[in-house]
Amino acid sequence: MLLAAALLSGCGAATPASAQPVETPEPSEEIVIYRGEAEMDLSDKSPDELRQCLPELSNLKEAKLNADTLSAEELGELQALRPDVRFLFQVTLNGKTCDPETEKLDLTGASRKTMREAFAWAAYLPKLKSLELGEGDAADNSIPWAELAKLRAERPDLRVKYEFTLYGQEFSLDSEEMNLTHIPMDDQGALVKAVTDCMPKLRYLDMDSCGVDDEHMAEIRDAHPEANVVWRIWFGDTLEGRAGYSVRTDVDRILASNPGIGGELTPENTKSLKYCTKVKYLDLGHNSYMSSIDFVRYMPDLEATVLAMGNWSDVSPLASCPKLRYAELQTTCINDLRPLARLKNLTDLNLCYNFALHDISPLYEMTQLKRLYLGMYTPVPAEQVAELQRRIPGCEINTTTDNPTDGQWRYTAVTPYGNELAPAYEWLREVMRYEEAPGSYAYSYNDPLY
């Protein structure tokens, strides 16, 4: 009779007269379980007693609880245990009695402790529509931001009203844009992250030159995939009086092919380029110390790139750029073209002066190719060139030029009025803004937003 005794003590010694005992025979003893009615007052039961008896009350549909002896977390556990039961309770939050029918809750002026408790209970007030927090300064530590963020994640339908200042600027939790550019921050953006985690409508955050490093900015960005989070990166060599390069992470064009001013690009000083995920046009040519282009795999919108005259060999990052149509990859250490085979939009490809390249068969199925420049020094078997020409008869394949950009790669004719540009190269010059150089280079002093 031990189980029967536990259930009787846990769920009320007085069984309703209408309840009939259900006998469950056991080989050695008889156990009687009272399953109760559809509605029960369990306000005198402790959380442990409730956890014990609720699974046995199979007819229960509604139960009254005592919030004075129950935490919001424990209520959540009971709801998970019996999601089919409606739990009734009353809890005092900031001096106001709240229950499952409460629709509005005003926490204006409440202490941080009270707010933390209220946020926990608000998740279990199903009809709560509006939560008022008043106004204040985001930095005064009055709002428990982590708990509020948790509530907003659990109750995205809940309208939370709070007007606040952040670094001297005015916002609300419903703000869609936040411009904090050039405001020095000494906490690696921790306060901004805490606040913006509570702003579900945020779509634009500008933190250009705020002193927050790339890794912490990336954490803020990753927490808001629906928003455009922008900051400034630096790459290249700033030693020996060089300017280096600097761009905002939302740029669509980067021209950094002048190591004499920007410094030589290396794997170490180009890591930050991976945060420029909106780049369409990229020219990093003439950087002989650049032995990796791994950052390119984070540029899915890339359409044109010049990565010539580098010391890199792994072309696989370009496989993550499905929109790529123009690529100058001459004078590198490329030895395997297989990753390029999936680039169905690539039409103009320059592979001249690639002495480690001996196999172009991965290009056989790239029937969209219009121009392939191998030049006279890329050691590709003649039979492969012939086979590629047979498969793609409309492709211009050059195996004779001794200069990667000669032939008709850049110019199709010389006239009394100047050189006639090849259409693809003319497009490249336009999107890269070569005519505006040096003003089009990615030097910080060329950026009006710096």
Descriptions of predicted regions:
Residues 7-10:
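C-terminal motif of bacterial Sec signal peptides marking the signal peptidase cleavage site
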Residues 25-29:
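N-terminal export/targeting and maturation segments
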